[in-house]
From Swiss-Prot:
Any one cellular-component term (Gene Ontology): mitochondrial inner membrane
InterPro entries: Cyt_c/ubiquinol_Oxase_su3 (IPR024791), Cyt_c_oxase_su3_dom (IPR033945), Cyt_c_oxidase-like_su3 (IPR000298), Cyt_c_oxidase_su3-like_sf (IPR035973), Cyt_c_oxidase_su3_a-hlx (IPR013833)
Top enzyme class: translocase
Protein name: Cytochrome c oxidase subunit 3
Organism: Pan troglodytes
Keywords from the named record: Membrane, Mitochondrion, Mitochondrion inner membrane, Translocase, Transmembrane, Transmembrane helix
Length: 261
């Protein structure tokens, strides 16, 4: 902030946007190689480059915000707007999956037997594992709110406990979802039902894994005394993201598991 007459963070030159773009090129090329030639070398290289880029870029962001004081109130306001826009883009991303599901289920074609679920498909019972998954995610929504309130009250120990509980519930949800996939009587290849089911719930599962990782980083940062009641946007963004994941699951449960079965 030296020799600066404004509160905005003037970011110094960084290699991470370039390495991030390179990793995106390697991953997309690697996916094509994997799909067509069954070679995972390029994809592995892309994933490794992407992981290293994310780690080092966010490490720099944490240093700038926590130790160098660059995340002033106007900068934090910009970060909040950025996170809100990101979550909005995710809402539209999932809207596409719901559109595909309702387009297929509200007016089933003769090829599907004229009804939904299509002929030959045995849907999962919504009152078994899906209902347990719903309970787990709702409980995690309560625990992340508990963590937030504990942070605002400067109760460090309760914040750590609540955050750890949230992460464990996220892990439990992921394991339940994986077991459900392995035991499912249909696959992603079973027509439009299998496609919409596995793509929608699979992308949600991916978001749960991302959110759990996000919260794990927040737990590590809390253990390192990075957060205060006045300065904790990293945790706030993770909590917003987790609540978004919760709400999307409720729509998935009601639409695909309950109504769709």
């Amino acid at each position: 902030m030296t020799h600066q007459s404004h509160a905005y963070h003037m970011v110094k030159p960084s290699p991470w946007p370039l390495t991030g773009a390179l990793s995106a090129l390697l991953m997309t090329s690697g996916l094509a190689m994997w799909f067509h030639f069954y070679s995972t070398t390029l994809l592995t290289l892309g994933l490794l480059t992407n992981t290293l880029t994310m780690y080092q870029w966010w490490r720099d962001v944490m240093r700038e915000g926590t130790y160098q004081g660059h995340h002033t109130p106007p900068v934090q306001k910009g970060l909040r707007y950025g996170m809100i826009l990101f979550i909005t883009s995710e809402v539209f991303f999932f809207a596409g999956f719901f559109w595909a599901f309702y387009h297929s289920s509200l007016a089933p074609t003769p090829q599907l037997g004229g009804h939904w679920p299509p002929t030959g498909i045995t849907p999962l019972n919504p009152l078994e594992v899906p209902l347990l998954n719903t309970s787990v995610l709702l409980a995690s929504g309560v625990s992340i709110t508990w963590a937030h309130h504990s942070l605002m009250e400067n109760n460090r120990n309760q914040m750590i406990q609540a955050l750890l509980i949230t992460i464990l519930l996220g892990l439990y949800f992921t394991l339940l979802q994986a077991s459900e996939y392995f035991e499912s009587p249909f696959t992603i290849s079973d027509g439009i039902y299998g496609s919409t089911f596995f793509v929608a719930t699979g992308f949600h599962g991916l978001h749960v894994i991302i959110g759990s990782t996000f919260l794990t980083i927040c737990l590590i940062r809390q253990l390192m005394f990075h957060f205060t009641s006045k300065h904790h946007f990293g945790f706030q963004a993770a909590a917003w993201y987790w609540h978004f994941v919760d709400v999307v699951w409720l729509f998935l449960y009601v639409s695909i598991y309950w109504w769709g079965s």
